[in-house]
Amino acid sequence: MAPWTLWRCCQRVVGWVPVLFITFVVVWSYYAYVVELCVSTISRTGEKGKTVVYLVAFHLFFVMFVWSYWMTIFTSPASPSKEFYLSNSEKERYEKEFSQERQQDILRRAARDLPIYTTSASKAIRYCEKCQLIKPDRAHHCSACDRCVLKMDHHCPWVNNCVGFTNYKFFMLFLLYSLLYCLFVAATVLEYFIKFWTLCRRKSTENCPKNEPTVLNFPSAKFHVLFLFFVSAMFFVSVLSLFSYHCWLVGKNRTTIESFRAPMFSYGIDGNGFSLGCSKNWRQVFGDEKKYWLVPIFSSLGDGCSFPARLVGMDPEQASVANQSDYVRSIGSNQPFPIKPLSESKNRLLDSESQWLENGAEEGVTKSGTNNHVTVEIEN
């Protein structure tokens, strides 16, 4: 076995360690809460009604948490469609050229009919040498997955997967339900945690008040109640900050990568280039049908290869002024931004500036056509 192949195999094995750790914590929390707290402790104190309510609510949060976590892990990140790959002749000419300028000319001709509006910081076509494809807007190459991922947000070690277009909604729901799960566990365990410290801080259970429904009456629950509260509180605080940050990103229609390195458009760098207004930004991730918002079912809008941009239909000079003054905030809430299919997309970014002057802003009108579809793969 080649050293590189062996290294990749080791990486894949080690990548599952954080997932196994989370799985162990979740399984232990289930046992500690259901068996040690509810069955062995609360039910024996005569509080049958409380036990039933706690168990029903707990299993609701638990199922939604595990479901969203599973979908985040096993939903395969989408890669660019075949339109973004160079043809054999284009690839051969590109590899034979040593001049970067001529290579860019080849890429510009290949990308003329693609819905690409962003470039690299040096105004070059974003091309992936490893995957040998022209990167769609917001797509990036993940070194851990060794592939280009559509609308890549980040590679998350806790799910051993890339978070991108196909599973970003699942990732958000995973954060939400893990937050609610930890909050519920911490809040319901707190009562018995306090009794443990205030009523029975003595050397043996024989000295504890016999009429108190305290966890020390059941020695096996002491360890679990103590650590269950600490673990749930700790995870709640850490997940809360991460969830708040990603809510802010969704509201701004940015990825984690774009928050650190704003995309480059024809009119310059614009961190809000894909922002259509808070409401539309949220619907891009969660979809138009509210009944699916809280369910780990794919409902995101678009095809992952092309995204509506707020200034794309404007003259470059006007766009530059609008970008500086942030004058287009109202666009997001009032005007539609349809996504054009790849077969009928007109690439304004890669055309010459003279075409802007000839065609004017009317080039921004979207043609009708068949839609591209993204297939969400679930790996078993």
From Swiss-Prot:
Tagged with keyword Zinc: yes
Expression (tissue specificity): Highest levels in lung.
Record protein name field: Palmitoyltransferase ZDHHC20
Stated family: Belongs to the DHHC palmitoyltransferase family.
Membrane topology, record value: Multi-pass membrane protein
GO molecular function: protein-cysteine S-myristoyltransferase activity; protein-cysteine S-palmitoyltransferase activity; protein-cysteine S-stearoyltransferase activity; zinc ion binding
Lumenal side: 36-53, 191-222
Changes after translation: Autopalmitoylated (in vitro).
Organism: Mus musculus
Site (Important for selectivity toward medium-length fatty acids): 29, 181
